[in-house]
Amino acid sequence: MPSTEFVGYDHDSIDDAKVVALVVEGEQAEAMMSGVEGIVVLDKSPFYAEMGGQIGDTGVIRCGESVFEVTDVQKNKGGKFMHSGKVVSGSFQLGETVEASIDAERRMAIRRGHTATHLLDAALKAVLGDHVHQAGSLVEPDRLRFDFTHFESITPEQLLAVDTFVNDAILRGIPVVTEVLPIEEAKKKGAVAMFGEKYGDVVRVVEMGDVSMEFCGGTHLDNTAKVGLFRIKSEGSVASGVRRIEAITGRQTLEELRNGQEKLLRAAQLLKTTSNELESRIGGMLSEMKEIRSQLEKFKEQASLGEARSFLTSAKEVKGLKLVTAQRDGMDANALRKLGDFLRDKEPKIVGVLASVNEGKVTLLAVCGKDAVASGVKAGDIIKAIAPICGGKGGGKPDSAMGGGTEVSKVDDALAAVDDLILSKLG
């Protein structure tokens, strides 16, 4: 059985294709009935079989009232196009003459993506350097993925330059010309071959003015202007020395731009401004929020210091030292430390142990005034002793130490242990 003749460069539909093979459940068949999934092989086809990064076409194969819905097309080693799908009505017989029609709108969207891929390749070489080589690609309707060799991260400025290069080439409306040439002649013309790809003696060359000239068997537009719109969605590393760009084209880009505009308008309405003034409005609100946060922190600090003063007046006398133990949940380590520093700096005889439960974790702080340290009571020793009670650990200096734990139910036990610990230190 000869290989399938591809006629899809010039035709979206043909009415004289012959069914040369039917495959059902992996076995060749004489017929394929309604509701059956399988593979149809034709002597010629307008359907593009997936290769070179471009996905296969979809569409229908018809014979009278019988319809086979094509969902994928692959090319086997023998060059036959395997049209996978399902008989949705009627039946098909081996040897029948059928009409084969691709989804032309979907093919057009794929063409946009493929032509844009060539422009992107040229843009990367122009912006990053000639060391850039294609390392893989995937072309789908109105979107593409392009892998390429490059040794470092791409800066936002470089990415913008690549995007601008592609869109400028689209706006120029460059004719897309295809030629079938002997491979040596194609190389002499300057056509770029995909790195590592094997080619026959004759190759198809796709040329876009002075921007791009590459070996390519895929389907393309006849003018770059028909790409319409191009937008890079993401860029990143996929392997050592290999990076990936994902981009959208055509209607997909238009849809995203519309969605983005709608979101801007909704955001502007929420903030009672216009989309043009949105940036300055948000900037002003962020400044206001920063000022409010600053004032709130000051109020919290003042309230905390007021609480610290009350701690000092109600401190417990233990052999000449003043002991404060307290739990204040919701305070972070920094706020707890400020409270402890105030106690230590105001009262040389202070031994303060503070605890806070925040997001399911325990933070412990111990502070000792200079007289307390001189008498042998050290903050680091206190934390080392009580943190394990809360399922944690900690330590620090004689006058200030911190620790933590995960057993929030043990905080009371940890604080209660401080009295006996100090008494043991003082003897």
Label every model-predicted segment.
Residues 1-427:
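A glycine- and charged-residue-rich anion-binding loop/surface
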